[in-house]
Swiss-Prot record:
Keywords: Antibiotic, Antimicrobial, Cell membrane, Chemotaxis, Cytoplasm, Disulfide bond, Glycoprotein, Hydrolase, Lysosome, Membrane, Nucleus, Protease, Secreted, Serine protease, Signal, Zymogen. This is Cathepsin G. Belongs to the peptidase S1 family. It comes from Mus musculus (Mouse). Residues 19-20 form a propeptide. The active site is at H64, D108, S201.
């Protein structure tokens, strides 16, 4: 466990690699039992993302959070402490959406199949996913949680939360060349200094206790609005993928397998 703590410390000290919840506050410990912290190893080095438990054996995150190996920490509040509630699970299989495009960041969604099932507890449990009959509307108030930096110069190792409102699609279409209202959500009032940013990527946008979006990208300076992947548009793919990859828990390997479906 000690090497992992050292790696987490390294990640949190990297300004460009660590994520930001801007304008938020510290969350009540373990009030977001679906939250996952992802420690990612890639040829470029170490990075961190958010994610969220959607079934005992699957975490949902952003497709751009892929690496050669991923460790998932569930049940955490302070990611630099060895909390009794924490469950550290390696990823067996990373399944990017087959139409993910890193050039325009479209279809930025990925399922992570865990090497073993998470144990449900008061600090670890899945979040609900959206139904087709209920759609987000501009003005809806939602919550984003994540670890990382809270400003350009100040970091944190405890889970942060911020409330953000859904915006009109046109606002993001005016700011981001490749914004697609069919598969993305525009979130965050530009008149407020509140946003999710960068390493918070992969974390959930939760509205009325349902995960509706995934932190995807925003402006370089973190000013809102930001773009979130619209989970509802990908529900057929999510359900099909989780059915296809039946749980097969194996001993840890040095690298994870990658699949598309």
């Amino acid at each position: 466990m000690q090497p992992l703590l050292l790696l987490l410390t390294f990640i949190l000290l990297q300004g460009d690699e660590a994520g930001k919840i801007i304008g938020g506050r510290e969350a009540r410990p373990h009030s977001y039992p679906y939250m996952a912290f992802l420690l990612i190893q890639s040829p470029e080095g170490l990075s961190a993302c958010g994610g969220f438990l959607v079934r005992e054996d699957f975490v949902l995150t952003a497709a751009h959070c892929l690496g050669s190996s991923i460790n998932v920490t569930l049940g955490a509040h302070n990611i630099q402490m060895r909390e009794r509630t924490q469950q550290l699970i390696t990823v067996l299989r990373a399944i990017r959406h087959p139409d993910y495009n890193p050039q325009n960041i479209r279809n930025d969604i990925m399922l992570l199949q865990l090497r073993r099932r998470a144990r449900r507890s008061g600090s670890v449990k899945p979040v609900a996913l959206p139904q087709a009959s209920k759609k987000l509307q501009p003005g809806d108030l939602c919550t984003v949680a994540g670890w990382g930096r809270v400003s350009q110069s100040r970091g944190t190792n405890v889970l942060q939360e911020v409330q953000l409102r859904v915006q009109m699609d046109q606002m993001c279409a005016n700011r981001f060349q490749f914004y697609n209202s069919q598969t993305q959500i525009c979130v965050g009032n530009p008149r407020e200094r509140k946003s999710a940013f960068r390493g918070d990527s992969g974390g959930p946008l939760v509205c009325s206790n349902v995960a509706q979006g995934i932190v995807s990208y925003g402006s370089n300076n973190g000013n809102p609005p930001a773009v979130f992947t619209k989970i509802q548009s990908f529900m057929p793919w999510i359900k099909r993928t989780m059915r296809r990859f039946a749980p097969r828990y194996q001993r840890p390997a040095n690298s994870l397998s990658q699949a598309q479906t």
